[in-house]
Amino acid sequence: MKHLTSAEVRQMFLDFFKEKGHAVEPSASLVPHEDPSLLWINSGVATLKKYFDGRVVPENPRIVNAQKAIRTNDIENVGKTARHHTFFEMLGNFSIGDYFKEEAITWAWEFLTSDKWIGFDKELLSVTVHPEDEEAYEFWAKKIGIPEERIIRLEGNFWDIGEGPSGPNTEIFYDRGEAYGNDPEDPELYPGGENDRYLEVWNLVFSEFNHNPDGTYTPLPKKNIDTGMGLERMVSVIQNVPTNFDTDLFVPIIKATESISGETYGKDNVKDTAFKVIADHIRTVAFAVSDGALPSNEGRGYVLRRLLRRAVRYAKTINIHRPFMFDLVPVVAEIMADFYPEVKEKADFIAKVIKTEEERFHETLNEGLAILSEMIKKEKDKGSSVISGADVFKLYDTYGFPVELTEEYAEDENMTVDHEGFEEEMNQQRERARNARQDVGSMQVQGGALRDVTVESTFVGYSQTKADANIIVLLQDGQLIEEAHEGESVQIILDETPFYAESGGQIGDKGYLRSEQAVVRIKDVQKAPNGQHVHEGVVESGTVQKGLHVTAEVEDHMRSGVIKNHTATHLLHQALKDVLGTHVNQAGSLVTENRLRFDFSHFGQVTKEELEQIERIVNEKIWASIPVSIDLKPIAEAKEMGAMALFGEKYGDIVRVVQVGDYSLELCGGCHVRNTAEIGLFKIVSESGIGAGTRRIEAVTGQGAYVEMNSQISVLKQTADELKTNIKEVPKRVAALQAELKDAQRENESLLAKLGNVEAGAILSKVKEVDGVNVLAAKVNAKDMNHLRTMVDELKAKLGSAVIVLGAVQNDKVNISAGVTKDLIEKGLHAGKLVKQAAEVCGGGGGGRPDMAQAGGKQPEKLEEALASVEDWVKSVL
């Protein structure tokens, strides 16, 4: 057997089947396209369902692929076994009604045993077949020539997922030798049994039956082949290594993690688990983000968040206490660059997403662990071994702990979590959110008699803001009426209207309905259940009756502001993609006459320079006087043109395409300017984060932008007056003041350091000798954790050999820092373990390296007790 790299194995598989007349199907995105039944692409065949179920006929019925996949159903085993993964590659060859068992078996054997290809020793291969699949048995025994003792009949060799195509399968196993099992009494030591010696390297599924609803099986008119070979497992056999993690797909990641942690892989099972978890999870997250998924609290995003936070938890066991996963992205990208160049191309963005998520979790991790420690203690004191659903929800909602992460921490303490109670809390939160969404005035038009109103009403407001119309429906408080009088609120449906009804982020129009006998001021317009525009207003004069002929007129000033802001929103969307990356997608918007608000997907803050660039691009497009064209097109044609559609939005067969020159192309039902020059000016007012992976920009256009800029100039003039300088000199004057402030701060820190030295010197008298070891545990005055660590370092230097624990109270919170000199570390003393037990006394938690560690607590009144416990801990270790 030749030694091959993982890249060579993958390419060799594709090349082999290409020679056999197969078309190479590119690896599809991990995020399923038009398949709501799947959270992730989880197998090689998942992307080919359209061919197998007959929706699409492939140009070539023979297909081969190398497909990336994600499965997280066994996540708790990842890192603890040799071959469990959340991300993996599946190599497969497929036949859609073309060849069948004979070719599939013959080619599999050729690929595995031919010296031109893999070159396995034939004597080390065994196969399993279904007991009733005599055809496959005969092919293996007579055509291939495998001895009968190496053909095992197993009942489990039948692929069936319920109703639909099914059939027997045959699996090929490689014997790795007696080093992986040689106990003749082991009942599982056979190909297909639970053992490490005989590894399954290929599964060939013969899809020849239809599983009927009544439970019977009938032959399929066209028989298919579906095979799967796990690349990671195959490479472990070819490279002759004990686990998948020892292959060239993982080793570079593990080595990079060794460099970050200072620990060594292969010396300790607990630490090895951490290395494996990190190596597996970074591959999954990097590829998923590359394909457009982002961490969040739902769906795919929740999976990514859970994986990242699980990796952070395990990283602590190898002394990594900072964001680090993002540093591994270039390593993953390099390993996979030949076949998956997109990860390398997007490496900077992927790293940015991961770093942001890590930083967010680290901000709450220690505090969350302290809370969890309290929860565990509370339950144990009650004699309970279950963390309540309410507590699990608090950790999830406040501190970002996925329930599975809390469960893993609980397992360390021999406890479980109340999943049912947690789900109940989650459902209550969803109900609260749903009620909040529904508690809006616009929903009032959806009830009552409107459900039964089916008369037609035509919207003409794209081309005009004024129209003659008749009142065809008149309502008050949701009930049909014949007339309304001055001062009364009404809802009106016209046979024809220029008023836009709120949708797609654009607010409803305002204006007037006028006739000789009445005037109605329209305050809002919403869509009725059957699509008509419902005008909500107040009768300002006269009497309004059903059938009344009116002139409907939208406020020109209001509509003018709305259309400027709406077209500017389209320009902003494209500018965001240009500057921040193509991952940016609209997550929500609001378009009013005075301002626009645009929510978008993006990780990390948008820098000042990026905002300036975005604003400049939008203004350049405005000043370029670009025509805006609007057309109705079939949805397929619009998508082919590259029109941006809102994710999750439902569109009909014919869609409205809004195009701004060759710069922006979107599906949109809103109102727009005819030329970008009409917008005049665009000014960003604010940019902020509104949730995990979602940012918000608020901006103004036209007259609003002019007013905003004038306001900023006014503030600048006022600042210049206060600084007694002119506008141009303000930055210099501010810089000078900042320099003066820094000098004052440095002087203050110097004085604090001197005071710290004095205090450090003063507490040397508190040093005690415990079993021949200098131990110093004292409460001190320190403004923050950095100050506390500095004092510990100074005392270590002065004492030469000592265990030091200093505690301070700041803003009703406890800070503790511990230090152990090198000579005492060799005796088994560990600062991280010491500070953890001290912090627990104060209702907190923490940890760190053997020589230096820190922790926090929430009960300052127990600090003295915590410091007093240090001597006993040292004695227990020595």
From Swiss-Prot:
Subcellular location: Cytoplasm
CDD domains: AlaRS_core (cd00673)
GO cellular component, one term: cytosol
Gene3D superfamilies to which the protein is assigned, alphabetical: 2.40.30.130, 3.10.310.40, 3.30.54.20, 6.10.250.550, Bira Bifunctional Protein, Domain 2, Threonyl-trna Synthetase, Chain A, domain 2
GO molecular function per UniProt: alanine-tRNA ligase activity; aminoacyl-tRNA deacylase activity; ATP binding; catalytic activity, acting on a protein; transferase activity; tRNA binding; zinc ion binding
UniProt: Zn(2+) binding residues: 566, 570, 668, 672
EC numbers: 6.1.1.7
UniProt domain comment: Consists of three domains; the N-terminal catalytic domain, the editing domain and the C-terminal C-Ala domain. The editing domain removes incorrectly charged amino acids, while the C-Ala domain, along with tRNA(Ala), serves as a bridge to cooperatively bring together the editing and aminoacylation centers thus stimulating deacylation of misacylated tRNAs.
Protein name: Alanine--tRNA ligase
Source organism (scientific name): Bacillus subtilis (strain 168)
The organism's taxonomic lineage, starting at the top: Bacteria, Bacillati, Bacillota, Bacilli, Bacillales
